[in-house]
């Protein structure tokens, strides 16, 4: 865009001439002197500011009218780049040429250029990265003017040596994932980090129960007032210097939450890479990020996305390391193998044959994707597959083996895990055990946990609701009647037993059906290390 034409009769040395060419074009000489025209696009490309143009012209005795100044200010504003948030996206409005600075972001598909609006569009996650890059290159930035509150609270607890190491490692980096076994005090680490950052914090939990546990732990381990903590959930949506929400609520309301926090804490962070939930991290601007998980490695490989969004895996300890130091109870893993009955074997074999025929050699992961696309063959194959799993999980001899284990462990505190509510109810009724499923209301659940905690012996039956998010009292025996095959679930269940107690050795029994995919998965778990190589046998192993 060409604007004001100007003349100068002064002799121009090379340096001055080159400066003029950074924001104007030389049109030639005539009787009035050297003629130039101001070129806005050239000025932008060379990152020349309006003040610089006026200074150079002033040295040559050239004054611009108020009209010219207003027109130039419109196209060459005070800032080189402006940021704004719009519809959950970060808008980058350049007034100078910046592609040379951010080309790598554009090449990777992180930045999109809107030709009509002449702006770059990306996720708010990249705000600080791009802002810092532009400032390092000398550009003047109009930032988002974020409303981040100060947080003046102090830590009242005591950290174990590995917790101190984890906190120090995180503080050196300002972001990252900390992986520690269940029962190792990840929440306390998060609270200590909140008191060190001393800025407004958003905590995202997987369940409502975890949300309440975080609130209670913050009140216990800091001098924070209850008014410092806001729960953002259901009808109660209070934003405070410390705001606690759930994955589902954060996903739905992230545009409201995005720019208000300096620190983002993601609990049970292995859930974050799910297609919907990763939007929480992508749309949140927080410059400091902490992920907490007992099992950060995902079976689908998406943990790499988790590490990218949260700052990489920066600290971890295995259960074995903490057991050696006495922080967790030692444990035994005991696999009990049972046979299918003749009737179950026949039905399983028939279904397996049907599955292989309908699946056409495709892996289960491929079938699941095809189901999402509405493929009828894949839908039929997965129906058969689920029937096969049900035969294995509900095998008659599993309940006989369960009976033997319960008799053997009589007098201990036992947790029984199953995938099926009907099976859980049947087991609880048979052994006069306590029962918690997804159908158990909050008050009843709290009552059961409170009672079970006081018992020296007893049985508590749990469905998958017990895998994460429940503060389950100490027990020393666990029995997996049915599971998903996931190592993550296996580790979560083992973790329920590892809280230390005098002379306690935790035992986790797994009842496995011979001659099925369940047996293959169980054999792979024998070599479990609990470190970063916690990859489960995937769904591919089931057929």
Swiss-Prot record:
This is DNA 3'-5' helicase/translocase StoXPB1. The N-terminus (residues 1-111) is essential for DNA destabilization, it contributes strongly to ss- and dsDNA binding, but does not contribute to ATPase activity. InterPro entries: ATP-dep_DNA_Helicase (IPR050615), ERCC3_RAD25_C (IPR032438), Helicase/UvrB_N (IPR006935), Helicase_ATP-bd (IPR014001), Helicase_C-like (IPR001650), P-loop_NTPase (IPR027417). Conventional DNA helicases unwind DNA by binding to a ssDNA overhang of dsDNA and then translocating on this strand with cycles of ATP binding and hydrolysis to 'unzip' the dsDNA. XPB1 is believed to be an unconventional DNA helicase principally because it translocates in a 3'-5' direction along dsDNA instead of ssDNA, thus it is referred to as a DNA translocase. Residues 320-328 are annotated as: Flexible hinge region. Residues 1-111 are annotated as: N-terminus. Residues 77-146 are annotated as: DRD domain. GO terms for molecular function: ATP binding; catalytic activity, acting on DNA; DNA binding; helicase activity; hydrolase activity. The keyword Protein biosynthesis does not apply. Disulfide bonds: none annotated. ATP binds at residues 180-187.
